[in-house]
Amino acid sequence: MSRLIVKNLPNGMKEERFRQLFAAFGTLTDCSLKFTKDGKFRKFGFIGFKSEEEAQAALNHFHRSFIDTTRITVEFCKSFGDPSKPRAWSKHAQKSSQPKQPSQDSVPSDTKKDKKKKGPSDLEKLKEDAKFQEFLSIHQKRTQVATWANDALEAKLPKAKTKASSDYLNFDSDSNSDSGQESEEEPAREDPEEEQGLQPKAAVQKELSDMDYLKSKMVRAEVSSEDEDEEDSEDEAVNCEEGSEEEEEEGSPASPAKQGGVSRGAVPGVLRPQEAAGKVEKPVSQKEPTTPYTVKLRGAPFNVTEKNVIEFLAPLKPVAIRIVRNAHGNKTGYVFVDLSSEEEVKKALKCNRDYMGGRYIEVFREKQAPTARGPPKSTTPWQGRTLGENEEEEDLADSGRLFVRNLSYTSSEEDLEKLFSAYGPLSELHYPIDSLTKKPKGFAFVTFMFPEHAVKAYAEVDGQVFQGRMLHVLPSTIKKEASQEANAPGSSYKKKKEAMDKANSSSSHNWNTLFMGPNAVADAIAQKYNATKSQVFDHETRGSVAVRVALGETQLVQEVRSFLIDNGVCLDSFSQAAAERSKTVILAKNLPAGTLAAEIQETFSRFGSLGRVLLPEGGITAIVEFLEPLEARKAFRHLAYSKFHHVPLYLEWAPIGVFGAAPQKKDSQHEQPAEKAEVEQETVLDPEGEKASVEGAEASTGKMEEEEEEEEEEEEESIPGCTLFIKNLNFSTTEETLKGVFSKVGAIKSCTISKKKNKAGVLLSMGFGFVEYKKPEQAQKALKQLQGHTVDGHKLEVRISERATKPALTSTRKKQVPKKQTTSKILVRNIPFQANQREIRELFSTFGELKTVRLPKKMTGTGAHRGFGFVDFITKQDAKKAFNALCHSTHLYGRRLVLEWADSEVTVQTLRRKTARHFQEPPKKKRSAVLDGILEQLEDEDNSDGEQALQL
């Protein structure tokens, strides 16, 4: 835990001083003091460190220490939702939503406090008591009751008046909804005693003048006339509906006219509680739009229902239907329909000028909903966010995408990847940074490969402390698929192909590190040897044009490799296709010949800050390094397969570790210009226009060959008698210790200790191992000198092993394991079918004299070859020279040649030996018999050792 809570701080504590106190113990990621809503300091605060060690050091130093004259308490924070977290007792803390259970030790109910609380409930009961209402009517003030009024008749007059008013309203109304509404309001007015006791009638109020009484009667007539006018005009009805809904939402008092229409005869400006409760409120779905895709129907019948609207828009499925009513509940002929997408809106607009129940319907797009006031304000501002144009909402169990906020500004992508990769493999991690300061913005998007892993991470990471800050994890929206636009009916094949290539640009199946286009190769070769491009592609000259271009590409590749090595690039990282890729280094390929480094820098610098930009002399392949991973991804996404000059730009993520240490400059640099001059003299085009690419290819590989020949040692097959079997090893002995003991005798080829997994999956030593020497003489010497030697308290038992050493445990991930050269024969795969044996011979004869070239054909023996062949050189040195030159990136007719070392030939003697072993070896024993034999052999050895000890 790297987050601390500091309690009992002094009143005068400021955030700057609070930060300075803890800044000496490490990097602070959060510092906050807590205040009430009124600005009063609550005497505690939170401090966050980047690591747990820094937080622990600060806790040990400040816990129970003094700041000014107050002793503070420093503790580790608890994660959100931790069951061991104490319950909040402060009045400022958020109260729990669970209902409180009544305690048994409650205060007696006859206290004054309880009497005050029970007063309103008792008064409600007295309102229903007829005798109490009669008591109130008798004891009214004489100024409020006429002296000639009959107390016995007052209870009947309100009921008769209510009935008359109801009849009058029913007679005046044309809508069935009004009668239904009045029927709901009638029970609220059937309490004459309540009317008599609480609110006297307007006719008997002495302080009410005659003019005011007449005005109250005139209001009712104006409302009825307004009803008729609003039914005639549809536009005014919509406006009235908007105004009425706004007043209901704001809760503002109604105008006298509307009060008169609602109270049905009550005193103006007074609305009884029973009538307010009986008033029918519209549901929220009729007031506010639920989606931003809304259409408006005009001219709908006044008896329209939601079912009619659904049938009218079939087969669309509306999200919500809002039938507009005026202030009195009458339908106005306007209907607002909320749809789920823009496509459904376009389909709904096609229903314009159709008929619904004999009425002509007009359909419009409603850009701004009439009754929408925006999403309701919530205490959580991240909720209720309107989706963007390129976003769509999807369940977390389907998308697997999380939105992580409140991240530390000192955290990095590696930290987040380490945190979330513990729950499952990640497919994408987007951590935005500020374009000016290059610092994180404090939030990130994490996409898991499997959505169930995202659900697990969402449940466990939300509320956890990460680098001193409490994380807040939410399900994220997902981006709309851009491929839908490319697959539109009107899209051309070219656009579809470009969209598909751009979508698959980061896939590893199309990665070729040193790819060079044939057109760029021809331009570079022609420029280098002062020739024209037509001379390079001249098919009338001697030799194949495809072979000529392939040899030119091989020469350029060798020059590029030499340039990269001189600039500190580790070429070994390019050998593994399955190696992990960098997040900041990009390989830019398929560049036109003569490209300048300034052009590459200008193209890529638009997306962020660049580090190193390497461009060889030919200008065909470049390496671009970004300082921030986010900017590198942005550049890769925008520039992949984009047009650069007149060719598409191919991008590839470089392997990790591509930039190594800068190599030391050799003393033979002064010899390079002379060698280069000799190469140029040998590679001048002849009068017929043929390029002497043979000498150029040999000279370009000379430097690489010399370095490899110095370290080259003929690796032969394992010779019998070179491997030792060591028993009685200590279980704690490691391979390094064992190798150090046996390496004193001679050069060790390999050293392994056999291990097995226990139930927990941990590899444990089995007590024996194998040591393989390069020569049998060294193994015999070690057998004599180290027999009985003590290692980690155990005497070793050494003998010659009769079998090969066990292979080391390898990962399940497939990697390219190059075969060792055992013969002078090379297996060539991916040969184009239009290539013939003469062209293959011409290509490989550049590097040495050939013995045979064979292209196997199908079983019939006719037709084209099968796409692979065997090239056998006379010497192994020539074979290795050709292999090192052509294995990197050589294309023949546009197909890359894949080279492997062929297996050694099976001779007649080998076949005879194998056949004899098959017939002479005894049948295999059962496993139990083999184990018994091993145990007997061990017992015999122990007995013989005991006899030798007795003799001594």
Swiss-Prot record:
This protein's record includes keyword Aminoacyl-tRNA synthetase: no
GO cellular component: chromosome; cytoplasm; nucleolus; nucleoplasm
Location in chain, cross-link Glycyl lysine isopeptide (Lys-Gly) (interchain with G-Cter in SUMO2): 479
Major localisation: nucleus
Residue ranges with Basic and acidic residues bias: 664-679
MF GO annotations: RNA binding
UniProtKB keywords: Chromosome, Cytoplasm, Developmental protein, Isopeptide bond, Nucleus, Phosphoprotein, Repeat, RNA-binding, Ubl conjugation
Ranges of compositional bias, category Acidic residues: 181-196, 224-251, 705-718
Protein purpose: Plays a role in embryo pre-implantation development.
Listed name of the protein: Probable RNA-binding protein 19
Organism of derivation: Mus musculus (Mouse)
Gene: Rbm19
